[in-house]
Curated annotation (Swiss-Prot):
Its main location: endoplasmic reticulum. This is Patatin-like phospholipase domain-containing protein 7. A nucleoside 3',5'-cyclic phosphate 1 binds at residues 170-297. Residues 58-1352 are cytoplasmic. Pfam families: cNMP_binding (PF00027), NTE_Ploop (PF24179), Patatin (PF01734). Residues 340-364, 384-411, 1295-1352 are annotated as: Disordered. It comes from Mus musculus. Keywords: Endoplasmic reticulum, Hydrolase, Lipid degradation, Lipid droplet, Lipid metabolism, Membrane, Phosphoprotein, Repeat, Transmembrane, Transmembrane helix. Optimum pH is 8.5. The lineage of its organism: Eukaryota, Metazoa, Chordata, Craniata, Vertebrata. The active site is at S983, D1103. A motif (GXSXG) lies at residues 981-985.
Amino acid sequence: MQNEEDACLEAGYCLGTTLSSWRLHFMEEQSQSTMLMGIGIGALLTLAFVGITFFFVYRRVRRLRRAEPTPQYRFRKRDKVMFYGRKIMRKVTTLPHTLVGNTSAPRQRVRKRTKVLSLAKRILRFKKEYPTLQPKEPPPSLLEADLTEFDVKNSHLPSEVLYMLKNVRVLGHFEKPLFLELCKHMVFVQLQEGEHVFQPGEPDISIYVVQDGRLEVCIQDADGTEVVVKEVLPGDSVHSLLSILDVITGHTAPYKTVSARAAVSSTVLWLPAAAFQGVFEKYPETLVRVVQIIMVRLQRVTFLALHNYLGLTTELFNPESQAIPLLSVASVAGRAKRQMSYGPEEQLERSLRPSEFSSSDHGSSCVTVSGPLLKRSCSVPLPSNHGEVDELRQSQGSGSNTSAFQESHEGATSDLGMAYNRARILPHSDEQLGNSLASKSKKSVVAETPSAIFHYSENFRDETGACGKTDAIFRAATKDLLTLMKLDDPSLLDGRVAFLHVPAGTLVSKQGDQDVNILFVVSGMLHVYQQKIDSLEDTCLFLTHPGEMVGQLAVLTGEPLMFTIRANRDCSFLSISKAHFYEIMRKRPDVVLGVAHTVVKRMSSFVRQIDFALDWMEVEAGRAIYRQGDKSDCTYIVLSGRLRSVIRKDDGKKRLAGEYGRGDLVGVVETLTHQARATTVHAVRDSELAKLPAGALTSIKRRYPQVVTRLIHLLGEKILGSLQQGSATGHQLGFNTASSKWDLGNPPGNLSTVAALPASEDVPLTAFALELQHALSAIGPVLLLTSDNIKQRLGSAALDSIHEYRLSSWLGQQEDIHRIVLYQADGTLTPWTQRCIRQADCILIVGLGEQEPAVGELEQMLESTAVRAQKQLILLHKEDGPVPSRTVEWLNMRSWCSGHLHLCCPRRVFSKRSLPKLVEMYTRVFQRPPDRHSDFSRLARMLTGNAIALVLGGGGARGCAQVGILRALAECGVPVDIIGGTSIGAFMGALFAEERSYSQTRIRAKQWAEGMTSMMKTILDLTYPITSMFSGTGFNSSISNIFKDRQIEDLWLPYFAITTDITASAMRVHTDGSLWRYVRASMSLSGYMPPLCDPKDGHLLMDGGYINNLPADVARSMGAKVVIAIDVGSRDETDLTNYGDALSGWWLLWKRWNPLATKVKVLNMAEIQTRLAYVCCVRQLEMVKNSDYCEYLRPPIDSYRTLDFGKFDEICEVGYQHGRTVFDIWVRSGVLEKMLQDQQGTSKRKDCGVFTCPNSSFTDLAEIVSRIEPAKVAAVDDESDYQTEYEEELPAIPKETYADFQSTGIELDSDSEYEPSMLQGPPSLTSPEQSQDSFPWLPNQDDQGPRLEHPS
């Protein structure tokens, strides 16, 4: 049995072995056969390849051996169709321009050919290539200053004559005989190094002009050390206008602390100030103008620099009493004549109490005596609940609406006329002045009515009744006033002096008042206060005692009152109005000497010292103030005109760094840090500057250390302003503006003058100017000037070259009065058109958008001449006309234009009305307030720097909330002047910029959002994910179907889109080019859409949200005052799990799959990459949210995802409700009103201009500024602790009233009278009779003010 089993096992083993060997053998054979088969197939393929190659080579050789026959060309059918199609299009395109006649047959043929043209385009499918904006360098005149400075060698006049002419020009324009008279007194003085020109103790009676060499002006400190405050170079002078005034008035004084010496061997021209006395004797009317200019310089230059910028107040005035003894008043009051300046105060107060005039306890009025003129009146005070009555103005009258003063001697008082213009009054006859006294009754700031009002008359001698005693005191006080004013004719004050008694607490005049009076205190005191800089607190400057004047500086200069006058105790004083004083001055010009001398005596010795250091410069257009790399030795203040700052880069290219307007501080950073000039600054147009040397600034810091705080404040504003400027921030982030025409730096702002020029004869320039004036009137006082009203006001010869100075001076005065002056040029190159261009800060080239973009004659003249003012292209469109198009062609033909705007004009602008009908129509238009949403209001806000920008952020479907916010903006009356955005914000912003209405924007946005929810389109757009998941074809078509072929330049609103340039690693701001392409590029998320190739330079553009998701800083750089930023981006989770130093993916997997484990918040790789991509964006967003110009809004849309486009209506409603709530709060709290107010009119101008020294830090600046020596503590006035707080109610002016649209918006001071008068039309368009009331402060054509006539 065992053997059988073994045999079976052995047999089985043998069988297995046999089968295994068979299997191995089979596999070997199979592999061999497979190998052989492979070798065979390979051999066959090789043979086939060799055979095919041999065949083609053989055929090619045979072809080469054969003689090639002449080819027979033929047109393919599609080529024939293309040829005839192009031929048809050429014919159809030219035919409409050659058709003549208005018959129906030609019109039908035109329509047929148009249909054929469109059909041919569809069949042939031509790809239309739209023109692109050509990048051009700015014109040389824009960024380059004139190379020729004040050239003495090439002049035909001697150098001494040129230098003297340059320096006496500060006193006004002297005619040739007057200047030659002055030149007779010039003396040459040779000085050696170290030799003194003058020293303390010598009489201060001369003007010194350096012809060769250099002088040093020194001020002696209290410890005897001399400080150099000014270096005088050839062409400059050493003088004090206050000292010249002392010589003219006969009160010469010696130098006390000021000296001058020659730093090197020098030649000096010496002109004694007494030479002016001889000129004034021959030309008495010149005296008024020279004194007025000296007073204007004192107020506008000295006080502007020392008070507004350095914060000095009490240091500028002499608190000591300058009163004269009231001898006549003392004799009448029954007291002995005393030598003290403030006279018999108690006796006068008892004699002038209101009870003296009352006949009963109920306050019945005294008998009023009146003759042919109202010579005297007296009254009792009314109860306080009867309201406030302006007794000052009621007693004196303003006379602004009476007829002009007629005088027979033409041309004899031209300087007096200019003085009248600067003082902003209209001359009157004596009778008109007297009659106006009883007719004027106004609301004022005076708390109570005066106890007595008397008008002086030497012919009236009635001392009976209750008013007799006061009448005697009044006449006695008037005699003392005659003594102070140095008048010997009492009749000059006849009917021109008012005697007032005010109780304690009366506010007599307020700081900033325009219509002021000269007050002569008889009893009591008037306290003079001034508001501190950047504070509401008042400080007491000085007290006006009996025998002293106050208010005379503002009357002489015509400038606003620079302090507040208040009676803290019962006070009696004489009052002379501005109009009355100028009537006295017309008869006796030398009256200004006595009045001006009282102003000079009130100035402190410190002001006298600084007057030697301060200079008043006149700079012609194109002249460089300083150049980049020059030594910083002074600071400039712009008084009038405009300056431009240009920086030269290392590669030699120039960039516009900024512009400076009226009141701006220039070069202060380099001066304080003692660094070289960082930029070149030149004059855009003729400008006036105040020059403050660095030495004078150092001397002021030594004497008054509190100035250091003010300087640090100014520097802080400069630095913070530069950081908040969009251009600066953009350059730090790689701001790439290659797509813009050229880098403008800061857009035009702080403009004082704007000129409008027509691009063709068909432009309705008159209607355009009136519409723009109407829109500007909502911002501030505006004046429209044309050649017609200039000739009507100033005479037919006003534009002649002989009267250039007088015209320039008058135009400068209008700039002082108005917020902005609008110049309407003529249709051709006339002298007035040249004057408009010369005076303009910005030039508007007005064209018709429907016309061909041809260059007009005036534009060609602008290109040929070096006009430095920036030019803006304004294209007018009809309301029912086609949308803007072909803007690129307009801009490419005008390289001198730095920007453009499209205006949709009302029908009245294009109406074919005659001039009288046009005037009549606009008279009615000006009775209504302008529409803040109109395009003209948008232009007005952009010209004045008050534009409101709307910035829309990116966030996918959450951006649908922005449509709801647009609805809320429209309902709450918030205008939008500039719009832009990123990603979905760029899309929504483009829709609104194209439509300008919420309803159309919502319809088109919803249409696009519905297309984004299509699953089929999404699937069809999928591609192999090498660059992105989608090809972008479907997304491109969805956007291009919305915007078609629109260009960014053709949008109604200024628009910009933000993209990320991954080729240059920079941010791109797109303001021109194909609209749909740049919107698509701004919406290209990485991984989903491929980058868009920029059609201009081929750079790859991605979603702008990676670098700036809420570009409020870009909108700020485009000129917006306020930026409303709507943030709809997703918020990142910040509460993440702290997992330690290492992280295991298995641990995270366990935490995720285990339902019982605690959930952890750890970012995955995709989230980490996304956050890295948005790091720069988050940083930029925080900067924007913390800026003071940005109003940040974020609707509650966190619950919606990025691709929830199907919830469009729901998200839109969320945005609307949030926006309506926020904007309603703005309306109630006054935020919206503040947005719409002029930034220069609501608050003091802050110097947040261009940061001209970018290489310094704030710490260094503060350290350098604080480097001063100890100084004495300034004496504090004992009266400074008086109560200074007061409340005042300004008169309410009805909005529906409208006085005049040619001088719209004149500021109505708290003490001014508002009497609306309806005119028939603007002075530029009406006869002189119709236009008389539109310039109430200017004399009539027949007046003897600024009227200019030919010498013949």
